């Protein structure tokens, strides 16, 4: 999460400015919440969604969103706020009923806090268990600019594969938005995209660019010596001595990271035409 001593707003302002110039709407999404909201590698947590248990983490979470909302309350480039990315992984089976209940309570508290400073923007609530479970929601009438957001990977491509999302959307009579999907073949991407559109579910595919060919619209060329970093992550680092022994040459690692930053620039990426066509866009 962005804190008072960081330059997060400067970075956000720059990116939002680029999007405004390009005519692109922005959805602000919190991927790494205080304490961790998921309990897996995507939220930099300690392998548990402590945000759902810790009052201080929850206070900071709400404060961050309130500061963001206050700053951007009248910004028309921002479409809305996606409060949490993929909260509460499915691993914690015995704890899920309690964690999911705490999530709904936190969503409501955060939404009401945001509305004190921003009555304009859409607020998006993701389902629990990888944005896939909406069955625990009991209240969706406390805000009139609210919608839900789902994620789905590695499923079928027909209507049945999203029927649970359709059923929940129709039950609550609020929009459902597919905030993440993809990571599949061009054929799968096209069929699933068409199914979403036929069922009036908006979408964004993940990711835009990646260092894996055919996983996005753009491919980042792999830097020289990048495999040194990859191999280091696979080695035994169970004590500090093994960490030191496994550590690769730091100059080569530094060069690989700097080369990555250079390769990530649009002009140096490779366009994946098949994936782009599958999304119904011109390559």
Q: Model regions: which residues?
A:
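Alpha-helix capping and helix-coil boundary motifs
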Residues: 3-7, 158, 185, 239
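Intrinsic-disorder/low-complexity, polar/charged segments
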Residues: 54, 183-185, 249-250, 254
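Extended, alpha-helix-rich binding/interface surfaces that flank or overlap catalytic cores
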Residues: 195, 199-283
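Extracellular glycoside hydrolase catalytic/binding regions
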Residues: 62-210, 215-233
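An active-site-proximal structural segment forming one wall of the substrate-binding cleft
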Residues: 1-83, 106-115
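Residue-identity detector for glutamine
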Residues: 2, 6, 37, 58-60, ...
């Amino acid at each position: 999460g962005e804190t008072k001593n960081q330059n997060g707003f400067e970075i956000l302002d720059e990116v939002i400015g680029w999007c405004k110039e390009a005519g692109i709407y922005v959805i602000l999404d919190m991927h790494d919440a205080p304490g961790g909201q998921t309990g897996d590698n995507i939220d930099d947590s300690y392998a548990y969604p402590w945000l759902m248990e810790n009052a201080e983490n929850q206070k900071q979470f709400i404060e961050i969103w309130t500061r963001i909302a206050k700053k951007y309350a009248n910004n028309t480039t921002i479409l809305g706020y996606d409060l949490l990315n993929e909260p509460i992984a499915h691993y914690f089976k015995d704890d899920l009923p309690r964690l999911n209940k705490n999530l709904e309570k936190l969503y409501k508290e955060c939404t009401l806090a945001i509305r004190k400073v921003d009555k304009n923007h859409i607020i998006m609530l993701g389902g629990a268990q990888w944005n896939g479970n909406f069955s625990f929601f009991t209240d969706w009438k406390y805000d009139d600019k609210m919608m839900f957001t789902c994620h789905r990977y590695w499923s079928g491509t027909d209507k049945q594969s999203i029927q649970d999302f359709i059923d929940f959307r129709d039950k609550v009579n609020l929009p459902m938005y597919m905030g993440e999907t993809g990571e599949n073949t061009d054929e799968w991407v096209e069929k699933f995209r068409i199914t979403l559109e036929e069922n009036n579910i908006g979408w964004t595919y993940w990711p835009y660019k990646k260092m894996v060919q055919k996983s996005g619209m753009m491919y980042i060329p792999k830097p020289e010596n990048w495999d040194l970093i990859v191999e280091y992550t696979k080695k035994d680092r169970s004590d500090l001595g093994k960490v030191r022994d496994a550590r690769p040459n730091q100059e080569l690692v530094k060069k690989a990271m700097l080369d990555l930053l250079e390769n990530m620039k649009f002009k140096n990426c490779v366009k994946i035409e098949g994936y782009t066509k599958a999304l119904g866009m011109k390559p």
